[in-house]
Design a protein with these regions (language model features):
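Extracellular beta-helix/beta-solenoid repeat scaffolds
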Residues: 97-105, 117
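Active-site region of the double-stranded beta-helix
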Residues: 1-95, 110-151
Length: 151
C-alpha cells in the first residue's frame, strides 16, 4: 500500500464545523420544540440522492461553488474531510455520524471506516463541481483512549 498523508479526526461540534457548514440538529433553544427551519435557500430547486462510500483513502477533494450539500448518515461509518474554499491543503476530518450541511465552495470528500457507508445527500438539482487532486492519498487517524488507530 502506498504511503499516505494522515489526518487526525476531530470531534464533530458546532464550533469546530462552523467554518465548513453546520450540523443538522435542533439549536439549543428552538422556538418550537417540534419543528425548526435550519437551512433555507430559495434560489435553486434541489434533489435528494444516495451516496455509497467504499474508499479508505482520498485521492482528491471536490467542491460545489454554487450549491450547499447535506450528508445524512444512513448506514455504516465514514469520515468527512473538509477544507476552506481558499485552503484545500488545510484538511480537517470529522466523524460523519451526525447530519451536516456544507457551505457552498467547501472542499470535501468522504472516506469509509466501515466496509461501506451510505449517506443521503440533498443538493441543488444542477451541481457544478471542481476537483483538487492530492500529490499523495489522504487517510485518517483515530485516537481512542490515547491509542491511535489508522484507517
Amino acid at each position: 500500500m502506498a504511503e499516505c498523508k494522515r489526518i487526525t479526526v476531530e470531534p464533530l461540534t458546532r464550533e469546530a464545523f462552523a467554518p465548513f457548514g453546520q450540523l443538522i440538529a435542533f439549536s439549543e433553544h428552538p422556538e418550537d420544540e417540534r419543528f425548526e427551519v435550519l437551512i433555507r435557500e430559495e434560489v435553486h430547486p434541489w434533489r435528494i440522492a444516495m451516496f455509497r462510500v467504499r474508499i479508505r483513502q482520498a485521492q482528491r477533494l471536490e467542491c460545489h461553488p454554487e450549491s450547499m450539500e447535506s450528508f445524512e448518515p444512513v448506514r455504516g461509518m465514514g469520515v468527512l474531510l473538509c477544507a476552506a474554499p481558499d485552503c484545500p491543503e488545510e484538511i480537517h476530518a470529522f466523524p460523519l455520524d451526525t447530519p451536516v450541511c456544507l457551505n457552498k465552495g467547501v472542499w470535501h470528500e468522504v472516506i469509509a471506516l466501515s466496509g461501506e457507508a451510505l449517506y443521503k445527500i440533498t443538493e441543488n438539482c444542477e451541481v457544478s463541481s471542481e476537483f483538487y487532486p492530492f500529490s499523495q492519498p489522504v487517510g485518517v487517524e483515530i485516537c481512542i483512549s490515547g491509542k491511535e488507530e489508522k484507517a
